[in-house]
């Protein structure tokens, strides 16, 4: 069985080509276009060529005088060609800016605006191979369905063939768009064309619809842009127009109609044009804003160095009788009348700060960071020839000689039955030896930091009724054999002691006379006695729990009762 297809009427009918071009144009602009194409795609020329496709009959399902249904294998490699026109983006960066987040792209103005140029594309050497299902009826036209992708290859020629990158990009994009067009849009186009060719009723109906659309377009009232003119309209010379002059204008008026724009918009358009021409970022000014570059320099350029001043630390303490007293130890200045602040914190300052005592410098004295400090140490212990005691005494005195105190702020506390005497040999403290010292260090009892915080100094007035020398003579002398000396191992580690809070009004000063040293020794003795009485009163008030914590007799252990 053979079939004869007449291909010449399709190639010779001009009306058919015109209608086919309109349908192809609508189909190409219907689908989403790539971002590089900035205008509509127009089918400029369509030619089916003189070579018809080759059809191989695989199956015939229905055959009658006015209908036909069958499956064919189609192969086409003719001389048909198609020419398209559009406008594309000349900036190659624009394609990448749309596919990436905005914060990752610099978005330069010259590249983001871009330049659109015309593009002409010619599709030729089209090769098709597919299995198609053909259903023909005079009343319903021709229906053609592709069972697979028909496009094998085609040749794409454009105005950018000299640039390999653009040529390859256009080849890939057009092939992808053409495959979608043949699978989805081409069967519908062929069906409508067949209805127009074989069905006169459909042709008359389609002509009537086209005439109505043209009439509607012709009768459409144009929108007058001057119905609501801008508020600050100006003419070509920049003169502001009033309402009467604007009302006299019309769409077909004088030659100055094109210049009737808002003055603000003209300034913005001019700034935008300048930014494209000069690559200016055109940063607008911000009202009521202070930029950092405008602010004066806040760096203080001072000549010389500033001595760091240590603030005086003071801590008020109140007794049980709701009495508030502040105790302050202050350093005395040197012989030249100018005090000095140590450049770094000493061990005594650290210990005093943690226990609440205040070691501040002279308020009102000047600071001399380059002057060497003079340290003075008061030796209050009895001379002794034992070298072990010398090592223990030097450990205590060296910590006191750092911050230039007149009286050691930390008094070592010892049991009453173990008096300690200082060495009789020469001990070098980098200070002035102030003569003889008292025979015995006043006894004191150790106190915990918690007891110092809770207990306050009671209001006790001590007045010496006899001279200090008489009291010193009445003291019993201890035997040298009864004294206990420290070993070098014990003297290397200073046990933690709590400094005493001396009564209000006591002031220590360094003098070179023996009477001043004895007076200081008597004051220290009285302070130790006050601390001992305070500790005894505290121990008596605490009761059972304090006794058990101090190591007294513990309650008897549990013993089961004998049956």
UniProtKB/Swiss-Prot annotation:
Keywords: Lipid transport, Lipid-binding, Membrane, Mitochondrion, Mitochondrion outer membrane, Transmembrane, Transmembrane beta strand, Transport
Cellular component GO terms held in the UniProt record: ERMES complex
Biological process according to GO: mitochondrial genome maintenance; mitochondrion-endoplasmic reticulum membrane tethering; phospholipid transport
Main location: mitochondrion
Xref: PROSITE patterns: SMP
Subcellular location, record wording: Mitochondrion outer membrane
Topology in the lipid bilayer: Multi-pass membrane protein
Residue ranges, compositional bias (Low complexity): 386-407
Basic residues bias locations: 365-383
4Fe-4S keyword on record: no
GO terms, molecular function: lipid binding
Positions of the SMP-LTD domain: 1-195
Biased composition (Basic and acidic residues): 531-540
Keyword Transport: yes
UniProt feature, compositional bias: Polar residues: 303-332, 346-357, 458-471, 478-488
Disordered: annotated segments: 298-499, 531-563
InterPro entries, alphabetized: Mdm34, SMP_LBD
UniProt subunit comment: Component of the ER-mitochondria encounter structure (ERMES) or MDM complex, composed of MMM1, MDM10, MDM12 and MDM34.
Similarity field: Belongs to the MDM34 family.
Described function: Component of the ERMES/MDM complex, which serves as a molecular tether to connect the endoplasmic reticulum (ER) and mitochondria. Components of this complex are involved in the control of mitochondrial shape and protein biogenesis, and function in nonvesicular lipid trafficking between the ER and mitochondria. MDM34 is required for the interaction of the ER-resident membrane protein MMM1 and the outer mitochondrial membrane-resident beta-barrel protein MDM10.
Name this protein carries in UniProt: Mitochondrial distribution and morphology protein 34
Species whose genome carries this gene: Botryotinia fuckeliana (strain B05.10) (Noble rot fungus)
Gene from which the chain derives: MDM34
């Amino acid at each position: 069985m053979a079939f004869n297809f007449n291909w010449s009427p399709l190639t010779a009918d001009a009306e058919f080509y015109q209608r086919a071009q309109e349908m192809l144009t609508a189909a190409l602009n219907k689908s989403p276009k790539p971002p590089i194409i900035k205008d509509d795609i127009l089918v400029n020329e369509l030619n089916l060529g003189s070579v018809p496709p080759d059809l191989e009959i695989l199956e015939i399902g229905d055959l009658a005088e006015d209908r036909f249904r069958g499956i064919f294998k189609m192969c086409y490699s003719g001389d048909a060609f198609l020419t398209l026109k559009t406008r594309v983006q000349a900036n190659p960066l624009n394609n990448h800016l749309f596919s990436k987040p905005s914060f990752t792209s610099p978005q330069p103005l010259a590249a983001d605006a871009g330049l659109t140029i015309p593009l002409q594309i010619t599709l030729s050497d089209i090769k098709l191979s597919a299995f198609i299902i053909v259903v023909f009826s005079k009343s319903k036209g021709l229906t053609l369905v592709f069972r697979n992708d028909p496009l094998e290859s085609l040749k794409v020629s454009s105005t950018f063939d000299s640039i390999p990158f653009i040529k390859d990009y256009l080849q890939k994009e057009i092939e992808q768009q053409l495959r979608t067009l043949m699978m989805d849009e081409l069967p519908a186009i062929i069906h409508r064309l067949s209805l127009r060719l074989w069905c006169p009723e459909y042709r008359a109906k389609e002509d009537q619809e086209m005439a109505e659309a043209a009439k509607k377009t012709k009768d459409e009232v144009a929108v007058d842009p001057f119905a609501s003119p801008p508020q600050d309209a100006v003419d070509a010379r920049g003169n502001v127009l009033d309402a009467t002059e604007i009302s006299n204008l019309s769409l077909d008026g004088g030659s100055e109609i094109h210049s009737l724009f808002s003055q603000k918009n003209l300034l913005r358009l001019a700034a935008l044009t300048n930014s494209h021409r000069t690559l200016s970022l055109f940063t607008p000014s911000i009202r009521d804003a202070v930029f950092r570059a405008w602010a004066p320099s806040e760096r203080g350029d001072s000549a010389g160095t500033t001595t760091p001043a240590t603030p005086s630390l003071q801590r008020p303490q109140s007794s049980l009788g709701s009495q508030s007293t502040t105790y302050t130890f202050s350093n005395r200045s040197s012989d030249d009348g100018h005090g000095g602040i140590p450049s770094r914190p000493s061990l005594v300052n650290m210990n005093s700060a943690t226990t609440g005592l205040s070691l501040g410098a002279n308020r009102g004295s000047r600071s001399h960071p380059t002057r060497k400090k003079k340290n003075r140490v008061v030796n209050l212990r009895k001379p002794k020839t034992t070298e072990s005691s010398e090592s223990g005494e030097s450990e205590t005195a060296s910590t006191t000689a750092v911050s230039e105190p007149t009286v050691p702020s930390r008094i070592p506390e010892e049991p009453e039955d173990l008096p300690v005497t200082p060495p009789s040999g020469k001990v070098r403290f980098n200070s002035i030896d102030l003569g003889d010292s008292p025979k015995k260090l006043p006894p004191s009892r150790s106190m915990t930091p918690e007891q110092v915080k809770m207990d306050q100094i009671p209001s006790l007035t001590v007045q010496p009724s006899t001279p200090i020398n008489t009291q010193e003579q009445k003291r019993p002398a201890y035997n040298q054999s009864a004294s206990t000396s420290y070993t070098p191992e014990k003297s290397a580690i200073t046990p933690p002691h709590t400094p005493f809070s001396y009564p209000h009004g006591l002031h220590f000063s360094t003098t070179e006379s023996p009477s001043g040293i004895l007076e200081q020794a008597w004051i220290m003795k009285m302070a130790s006695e006050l601390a001992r009485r305070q500790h005894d009163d505290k121990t008596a008030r605490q009761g059972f729990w304090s006794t058990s914590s101090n190591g007294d007799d513990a309650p008897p252990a549990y013993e089961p009762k004998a049956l």
